[in-house]
């Protein structure tokens, strides 16, 4: 299964594994608001995870 990370106002990136996707998503969050990083640890494989900060959002989800 491929995992997509979408950053609002930016392009999507596709990853081969959930760990790669979360590593990338974590970097995006660290650059903006490190306090919500704990939420990524709750992501389960196959589920949508999305976090909003300011006028931007980060979504991590499986590719259909």
Q: Which residues does each predicted region cover?
A:
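Ubiquitin-like/PB1-type beta-grasp interaction modules and other compact soluble beta-rich domains
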Residues: 48-49, 61
């Amino acid at each position: 299964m491929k995992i997509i990370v979408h950053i609002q106002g930016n392009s999507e990136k596709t990853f081969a594994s959930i760990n790669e996707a979360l590593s990338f998503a974590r970097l995006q969050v660290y650059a903006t608001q490190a306090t919500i990083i704990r939420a990524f640890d709750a992501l389960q494989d196959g589920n949508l995870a999305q976090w909003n900060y300011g006028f931007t959002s980060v979504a991590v989800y499986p590719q259909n």
